[in-house]
Amino acid sequence: QFWWAGDAEQVSTYWYAYHSRWIPLELFEGAHARQLAATLFEASRRWTVGLHFNKAQAGASADAVERGRRTAMNPAVFRAAALAIIAAGGDGAPGVPGHEPDAAEARAARDRVDAAARIVREATPGAGSYVNETDYFEPNWQSEFWGENYARLLQIKRIYDPHNMFTCHHCVGSEGVIPARAVSASGRAR
């Protein structure tokens, strides 16, 4: 088996929507904790909100934080106690007759996931998102995925890859690489 058994239901899932948000440690403490609980409850009325405490770095050893700060990771991770993930997907194999995703179901799930994510995002300004588990259509991806590291990373990119040979969607330096026709005015893929 090539994956953790606990994640088996995710294998070959066709994702309709996917959001993540670093949840700062301070929101779990003192007077903030009650507001965080209310926020998560309100968001959960729209869609399931999963909290992953194994991905954040608040409370990590000073050595681990120092080593981590030398990476591309959004520095928000070092202030976070958890990563909230709000996602929806289902069976489907686009392009395989008889196995197409249910488009109406996908749109409805996407709208509910987006609504839940908006609530969490509004309660965590500047907290950022985990680049590997996030909204493909994030409009503020430079700050959300890379935080204050973006300017430094872009300088490095321009030195070692001035012609943008190595790129991907929402990677450092990818501005303008994705054709405009691939994304609608609403920010959704066409």
PLM regions and their residue ranges:
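Soluble FAD-dependent oxygen oxidases
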Residues: Q1-R190
